């Protein structure tokens, strides 16, 4: 697999072109390898354009944390931060 920063560069390229499916595919790979990557989660928030997308993302976040992240306080803080960013975007729609 390419380096995470290279994959993020590709992701932002696709986001800039509004090719969200391609961006999502790359983000899924990044988050599989590094489920705590806040920049990848932030990019994921960028590709969500509706409240329904964002609600789906919240479910996805919960699933990733349940299945892929160890139960440690600082990781829970990361989850709370990402969910807060999603809620902020929902409020702005």
Regions found by a protein language model. Give the residues of each.
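Alpha-helical segment of the N-proximal tetratricopeptide repeat
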Residues: 3-26
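Helix-start (N-cap) detector for alpha-helical repeat units in TPR-like alpha-solenoids
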Residues: 4, 38-39
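Conserved structural position within tetratricopeptide repeats
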Residues: 31-32, 66
């Amino acid at each position: 697999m390419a380096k995470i920063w290279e994959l993020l560069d590709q992701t932002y390229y696709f986001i800039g072109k509004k090719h969200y499916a391609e961006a999502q595919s790359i983000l899924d790979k990044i988050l599989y390898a590094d489920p705590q990557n806040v920049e990848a989660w932030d990019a994921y928030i960028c590709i969500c354009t509706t409240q329904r997308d964002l609600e789906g993302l919240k479910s996805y976040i919960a699933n990733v944390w349940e299945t892929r992240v160890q139960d440690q306080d600082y990781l829970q803080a990361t989850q709370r931060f990402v969910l807060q960013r999603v809620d902020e975007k929902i409020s702005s729609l």
